[in-house]
Amino acid sequence: MGKPARWLKSVLLGKKPSKSSGSKDKERIVNGKEVVVISKIEESDVVSDLSSIGNAAVYTSGIVETQNLKHEDVSDDEIQVSEVQPTDSQDVASVPDDSLSESEKIQQEIAAVTVQAAYRGYLARRAFKILKGIIRLQALIRGHMVRRQAVSTLCCVMGIVRLQALARGREIRHSDIGVEVQRKCHLHHQPLENKANSVVDTHSYLGINKLTGNAFAQKLLASSPNVLPLSLDNDSSNSIWLENWSASCFWKPVPQPKKASLRKSQKKFASNPQIVEAEFARPKKSVRKVPSSNLDNSSVAQTSSELEKPKRSFRKVSTSQSVEPLPSMDNPQVDLEKVKRGLRKVHNPVVENSIQPQLVPQIAVEKPNGSLEESVNAFDEEKEDEVAETVVQQPEELIQTHTPLGTNESLDSTLVNQIEESEENVMAEEKEDVKEERTPKQNHKENSAGKENQKSGKKASSVTATQTAEFQESGNGNQTSSPGIPSYMQATKSAKAKLRLQGSSSPRQLGTTEKASRRYSLPSSGNSAKITSHSPKTRVSNSSGKSGNKTEKTLLSSREGNGKATPVEWKR
């Protein structure tokens, strides 16, 4: 410790040490005004422990030599202290600053990676443990639920078996055999009854015992002791419910409902019976249309018009058919129709050939003759005035076609006077003429022609319409003209009427003395005039060179348009 003491003394006291002692440790360099102080640290004074670095700063172990120079010659700015140079041992152990930073960085990165890996592993292990616990919890809950469901199912099955046993036992006991056995046991063997009941009970609950004796069922029941088995109380309510349930016949199949389409159709026909009538009535109309289209091959336009207006033609036919049973009420229309049909028969010989082989309508034609004669006797006294007017008007229209207008007017006045004086004689004469001159063969031909022409359609219907219009305009007295002489009876008097017309041409201008003889022949001559005026001879004499078919069409068209009879020429 001598050297440091001396150094301290020299520093504190300012004394100069000797050269011998400080030559080794000190070096002074003085260059004019510059002073350089170099201090060396002895190797013995180097502290190896890093923890004593702080204490070494207070208690310096090195030797620092300072030389006080003259304050005048040296300033503070000129003093330079050299850096402390490390010893040789320090030079060997020292490392550059750049290399230390890179290594530290590498070490830090390695340490960070290890820390992160450890932390991530910890988190992964923690998550795995959590998931493992969750899976175990789920399995536990699911197992508990499954066992609970199995126990409930087992209890339900046991209850069903018990219910079936009770139902079967009750059914057996209430059956005829069971009642008889109970009665016999109750009367004769009382202890046997108790024994039988015990046997029945053991048999009824045998299935339950087998079911509960199963190992799996026992495990389920043991694992869930809180589950209570199903218990049935044998009360009155349960017995009533069992009876109702048995009475419902649940074992029978449910009846299938009928199809809704059949019900709807039945309701429709029940609510609307008119639909059924309409469906049955439609084919009848088609049947009526078929023969009407095949009658006249020459009149194509007329058949087309009939098809366009079927309702009108049907109404006309129905009215004509409805009039026939009552000839005394609507005789004028029927008479005119029959007259025109007879004329058409005479004019068309082809139609006669087609009508003659038909024998079926003849029977139907003969029937109205008796009814006509009977109706004449009933209505003669009531409608004499109407008969007189119609007898006057019928020959008037037919005579206009062949005679001038002046002669017609004079004839009207004479005929009216004659008929007013002797009406009863005229009716008697007509009845006698009808009975004498009746020829059934010709009547059948004419009536068959009338039937055929009635089906033909428009010609007969148009003629009837025009003639009815003419008689309605002339008066209401035309309804019962000569009720005892129908038109198909008058058409047979053509030969006799010709002779009467030839003989009655001159006596028209005679006095009243000859009126009585003419009066008796008026109805026959008038009725015959209808036919003879349109006979083939008169048609030939009065023809103007036109064909018969064209004249018929012109006659029909003129009567339909004007409603009055016009002079028409007939030709064969």
UniProtKB/Swiss-Prot annotation:
In which compartments does the protein localize? Answer: Nucleus envelope; Cytoplasm, Cytoskeleton
Segments of this protein annotated with the region Calmodulin-binding: 159-178
- List GO terms (cellular component aspect): cytoskeleton; nuclear envelope; plant-type vacuole
Q: What does this protein do?
A: May be involved in cooperative interactions with calmodulins or calmodulin-like proteins. Recruits calmodulin proteins to microtubules, thus being a potential scaffold in cellular signaling and trafficking. May associate with nucleic acids and regulate gene expression at the transcriptional or post-transcriptional level.
* Keyword Cytoplasm recorded: yes
Q: SMART domains from the entry?
A: IQ
Does the keyword field hold Cytoplasm?
A: yes
Q: What is this protein called?
A: Protein IQ-DOMAIN 30
Question: What is known about its subunit structure?
Answer: Binds to multiple calmodulin (CaM) in the presence of Ca(2+) and CaM-like proteins.
Composition-biased stretches (Polar residues): 82-92, 291-305, 400-419, 459-493, 502-514, 522-560
Composition bias type Basic and acidic residues, residue spans: 428-455
Originating organism: Arabidopsis thaliana (Mouse-ear cress)
Pfam families, alphabetized = DUF4005, IQ
Region feature (Disordered): 75-96, 282-332, 399-572
The source's superkingdom equals Eukaryota
Q: Which family does it belong to?
A: Belongs to the IQD family.
Q: Which InterPro entries match?
A: DUF4005, IQ_motif_EF-hand-BS, P-loop_NTPase
GO MF annotations, alphabetized: calmodulin binding
Q: Where is the IQ domain?
A: 108-136, 137-154
Q: Which PANTHER family match?
A: IQ-DOMAIN 5-RELATED, PROTEIN IQ-DOMAIN 30
Arranged from A to Z, the UniProt key words for this protein are: Calmodulin-binding, Cytoplasm, Cytoskeleton, Nucleus, Repeat
**S-S pairs:** none
* Ranges in a coiled coil: none
Among SUPFAM superfamilies, the record links this protein to: P-loop containing nucleoside triphosphate hydrolases
